A protein has these predicted regions:
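Short, hydrophobic/aromatic-rich segments at coil-to-beta transitions
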Residues: 1-3, 30
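Short intrinsically disordered terminal tails
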Residues: 1, 75-79
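Acidic, low-complexity, intrinsically disordered interaction modules
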Residues: 11-72
């Protein structure tokens, strides 16, 4: 899912994550912050935190949902 700020400068992407065996990792979401097209930060958050943050970005920060496609991303289990 992609959320974009009103001015279009800040983009927040959220993706489910999977291991190298292609198994989805439950209750974990990859969050990627980008500013003007440059990736700033990646972090793994809980699914509850994902729901909370999406709500806050939309309600409080007035971000718009610009893409609902959420392909699972590979992540190292040791992270």
């Amino acid at each position: 899912m992609e959320l974009t700020s009103k001015d279009g400068n800040m983009v927040v992407d959220f993706y489910p994550i999977k291991d190298w065996s292609n198994n989805l990792i439950p209750n974990r979401i990859l969050k990627v912050l980008s500013f003007r097209g440059d990736q700033q930060k990646k972090m793994i958050i809980s699914r509850d935190e994902f729901y909370y943050q999406v709500r806050e970005y939309i309600k409080e920060c007035k971000y718009k949902v610009t893409n609902e496609f959420m392909p699972a991303q590979f992540i190292n289990q040791e992270v």
